[in-house]
Design a protein with these regions (language model features):
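Short, well-structured hydrophobic secondary-structure segments
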Residues: 43-80
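A short, structured beta-strand/loop element
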Residues: 29-40, 90, 95
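N-terminal intrinsically disordered, cationic/polar leader segments
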Residues: 5, 12-23, 38-45, 49, ...
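Short intrinsically disordered terminal tails
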Residues: 1-4, 131-132
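Short, structured protein-protein interaction patches enriched in aromatics and acidic/basic residues
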Residues: 71-97
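Short, surface-exposed beta-strand/loop "edge" segments at domain boundaries and coil↔beta transitions
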Residues: 41-45, 82-84, 101-109
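Mixed-charge, glycine-accented linear interaction segment located at domain edges/termini
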Residues: 98-132
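A short, sequence-level motif marking secondary-structure junctions
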Residues: 47-54, 88-93, 112-115
Length: 132
């Protein structure tokens, strides 16, 4: 799996919080390591931009969040597989989910309260990569 669940055991069962941080925490020639921190824990996952342009996906996700769209995803792919962050829903209720390559859901967040905060966080991540 291209992600590591670094959360305390059993902390995901009632996670309805928005993400607190999404950042690139390591950069190598062929890989970016992302860390997603949310109310009950954190994930780390790797992406190889040569396999799939995850930064372009994140830019599209931020655009969709800001425009109120009801379905968008970002894919983070490396030699070991992929992680998909998915946003879906309608009107004022959105569900955010994280899936591994086998399609198993990894708990993430839910609720419209996180929409703009998540878009802002993604924009900050993208700006940091432009400066790198």
């Amino acid at each position: 799996m291209p992600y590591q669940d670094a959360s305390p055991a059993g902390q995901h069962f009632m996670n309805f919080s928005r993400p607190l941080a999404l950042a690139v925490v390591a950069r190598a020639a062929d890989a970016l390591t992302f860390e997603l921190i949310y109310g009950f824990g954190q994930y780390r996952f790797d992406a190889d931009p040569a396999r799939h342009d995850c930064l372009a996906d994140l830019a599209q996700m931020a655009d969709a969040l800001e425009a109120g769209h009801d379905h968008v995803e970002a894919v983070f792919r490396d030699a070991d597989g992929e992680i998909r962050l998915l946003l879906q829903g309608d009107d004022d209720v959105l569900q955010f989910a994280c899936y591994d390559g086998a399609g198993s859901v990894l708990p993430w967040l839910q609720g419209d309260a996180g929409r703009y905060a998540t878009a802002r966080m993604i924009r900050e991540l993208l700006a940091s990569q432009d400066a790198a």
